[in-house]
A protein has these predicted regions:
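A short, N-terminal "cap"/entry segment at the start of jelly-roll beta-barrel domains
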Residues: 1-36, 50
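Conserved short histidine dyad/triad with adjacent acidic residue
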Residues: 24-27, 39-55, 90
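A short hydrophobic beta-strand segment most commonly corresponding to one strand
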Residues: 40-41, 60, 87, 101-113
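Short beta-strand His + acidic residue motifs that chelate non-heme Fe in jelly-roll/DSBH
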Residues: 51, 70-71, 88, 94-101
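Glycine- and acidic-residue-biased ligand/ion/polar-headgroup-sensing regions
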Residues: 56-68
């Protein structure tokens, strides 16, 4: 099977600011109960994904383009760029900010514990 990705544009994702595009690579159903999201995520300039907690799942972000600030579970703010992998473990909270004039692109996978 070959198909196009399902694209969703969200304003204020998880209480964040601005626009985030979610290009779902496979659907939740196609993950067969192993997870809820596998997507190419584009955080538009001066936008963010708000602070939220992962209950019952883990999420790695792999940055492929642009620069951003990862807000970790302990509140620390870490500059990230292409090639960086941010791992959010079960029970942890996090946020991601794009404070630049360019898109921040990453691959995100949310899988169940």
């Amino acid at each position: 099977m070959v198909r196009k990705t399902d694209v969703k544009v969200v304003e204020g994702l998880r209480g964040g600011n601005g626009t985030v595009e979610l290009h779902h690579i496979v659907s939740k159903e196609e993950l067969n109960g192993h997870g809820t999201m596998y997507a190419h995520v584009i955080i538009k300039p001066h936008s963010s994904i708000g602070l939220h907690q992962h209950v019952g799942n883990t999420e790695p972000y792999y940055i492929i383009k642009g620069r951003g600030v990862f807000v970790d579970n302990d509140g620390s703010r870490i500059d990230v760029g292409p090639g960086d992998c941010c791992i959010i473990e079960v029970g942890q909270s996090h946020a991601m900010e794009n404070n630049t004039d360019e898109d921040l692109e990453m691959i995100a996978l949310v899988y169940n514990e």
